[in-house]
């Protein structure tokens, strides 16, 4: 009789646990992004038909920022679950903001990989700036101090003996405003990130002074990060999320889906789809199909951020990487 009661209690407990799991609220994942199409969070929900776990174990809320530096504050305040940080703001978040529990969980894209696109820095085609030295005494633009494009720009100008404040002035503005600022001669150089760098009007009035590869070589430009307590608490949901994300990103990277990807890009940006013929080709930045970062390149990029004075010391990126979630998710797709 006692054995029967124990069996009944065990079965009841198991059923209760299963019911509780089924009735649990999906984990809310707020994801950051800056540039439309270029950042996965801006287009991931356009293929939610491939997200088998969406609405079950997790939900997604994309959140737009002007640059990666403001994301540091947001993730520190618990306003983001996943932040797509640049190599520079990764270092700032860990060293300056004290987020030692920040973990690199996946890769977004890399700049300067051989045969692929590299970020451009543009000046007026008919303007006085012919070489980097000509920027002495001029005004250059960035999206945010400490962003990836900002740090790379400073690194290039330093190669030519030019230092911020002493030799040139930096002003900040959002990427969509930069073409007008250049054409109106309010600034002398802008960082032209994709998709803005392929704007036909910008191509008409501007020319490329240098590319990021010239300044700093291969860059693990953007990585996905999350805080360890969130990952520990929600690991199962995060594996589901990364499984869906890999399925979606691989769909975008498949050349057979290129036409539909262009149509999605046109719809998201309210631009003609034919403007996005470069998307997910070698005219685009490099995207790893497994979303695994290049930690060697990333360490060099973080070290450079230290050398430019944004952080006092460079964190060891391997100690701040947890790739087990994306690796587990990838195994499900084999």
Residue spans for each PLM region:
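Bacterial N-terminal signal peptides
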Residues: 8-18
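Bacterial N-terminal signal peptides that target proteins for export
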Residues: 1-9
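Sec-exported extracytoplasmic/periplasmic mature domains
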Residues: 47, 55, 76, 80, ...
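Conserved C-terminal helix/tail region of periplasmic/extracytoplasmic solute-binding proteins
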Residues: 302-334
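Short, glycine-/small- and polar/acidic-enriched structural segments
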Residues: 24-163, 169-173, 188-194, 218
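Secondary-structure end/capping motifs
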Residues: 232-312
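Sec/Tat signal peptide C-region and signal peptidase I cleavage site
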Residues: 19-23
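Pocket-lining segment of extracytoplasmic ligand-binding domains
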Residues: 88, 176-267
